[in-house]
Amino acid sequence: MTPTATAVETARPMIVGIAGGSGSGKTSLVRALAANLGDTQVSQLSHDAYYRDRSAVPMTVRATLDYDVPEAFDQDLFLAHLAALREGVTIRAPRYCFETHCRLGEGDEVGAKPVVLVDGILLLWDPAVRAAFDLSIFLDVPERMRLERRLARDVGERGRSTASVLRQFDATVRPAHATYVQPTQPLADVVLGNVGRLEPLAEIASALVLDRLARRARARAGAA
């Protein structure tokens, strides 16, 4: 039976970071967790929304930039929004267009619900971001499977060609994974392999979140 979080109350949002390489299934796990825990209990935020706006850069240059390094992100805004959510303040995350590499203004509101699920490839690289998480999960997936998933996503959802996705993977994604993503795996609270069906993985992750929520509730009760 799928657990629900409705019986567990928290004093402030519990922020859960879900990290891992491109194509590791982070977004899919976030959606499954939200379904398991209940949409009324969960907010979702993607680090991808915080890519820097490249509207001032010629399109021919934008296509050659490296989007898999820490400098590609507006980290100051991301940290400010995480801090606001921790304080119970609703934020409005940016909207980013992957086809044009431009920011499209403000997106939907992200409320400070009992659980805030955050996903991104470089979530654990920045110590300040790591410190914002009450629980961090790293999804460990073999490179071949990550590439297959990235191809399906970028070609099917982001208007990319197969050739361009493969070029980018070889030029920037693979080296950045080795330099910035994989070294953060030991920094996660929990490492989960995501090579099979999503449902069992989501059940495990849901149980981890509920356990942390229950611990916080017990700690508050003991301090009262």
Sequence positions of predicted segments:
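Hydrophobic positions on the alpha1 helix immediately C-terminal to the Walker A/P-loop
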Residues: L29
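Conserved lysine of the Walker
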Residues: K26
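ATP-dependent NMP and nucleoside kinases share a basic, alpha-helical "lid"
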Residues: L104-G156
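Phosphate-binding/switch loop-helix module in NTP-utilizing enzymes
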Residues: H81-V116, L123, L210, R216-A217
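NTP-dependent small-molecule kinase module
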Residues: T2-A7, G111-A112, A152, R174-A224
